[in-house]
């Protein structure tokens, strides 16, 4: 996999994280910052090009959301770079084999899979949607590293209180300004929030934690 790949800064975050001694990479960010897409690019073009015979779990709270977002992006990337091979795609199990690595897509409404086999790399998309118990079940079965991304749309959350404070975490915050590929029309719509909705601008424009009601 030596072809030219268009990435943004989030890809570099993943590259540097995996070569560090930290266990958890946290990608907090606003809308359209390219978090999810570039984490997938990193998994495909860095992690899977170096390693083989690994199990990579990509998860979100419910399967419809998983299919409509991160799964769609994953297969779009494979097809864009001519890596997709239908023989490697187990559609019934939502798995794909890449360089002898198994990439499995599971949702938290599949408890048997959550409590199933161990994995080497875990990516939780929109991690703020899941509860503390689900997080614990996932990390107990992850032998390697963990990547999470989310929009900080809650003013309080276990991620802030129990994960960000760990000493084995690398934290990044990104916004639409970190994504050179964003459509100009989307930039205009996001920047309208400055005048129309301060709370939405805080979260989806600036990638900052939502204000509590006492702060508004």
Predicted regions and their residues:
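Pre-P-loop entry segment of helicase/translocase ATPase cores
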Residues: 1-24
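ATPase catalytic-site recognition across NTP-hydrolyzing enzymes
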Residues: 179-216
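Short hydrophobic/aromatic beta-strand immediately N-terminal to the Walker A/P-loop
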Residues: 25-28, 148
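Walker A (P-loop) phosphate-binding loop of P-loop NTPases
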Residues: 32-33
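Conserved RecA-like ASCE P-loop NTPase motor core of nucleic-acid helicases/translocases
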Residues: 54-66
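Signature of the SF2 helicase/ATPase Hel1-core->accessory helical subdomain module
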Residues: 128-179
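Inter-Walker segment of RecA-like/P-loop motor cores
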Residues: 64-120, 207-209
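Walker A/P-loop NTP-binding motif
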Residues: 36-52
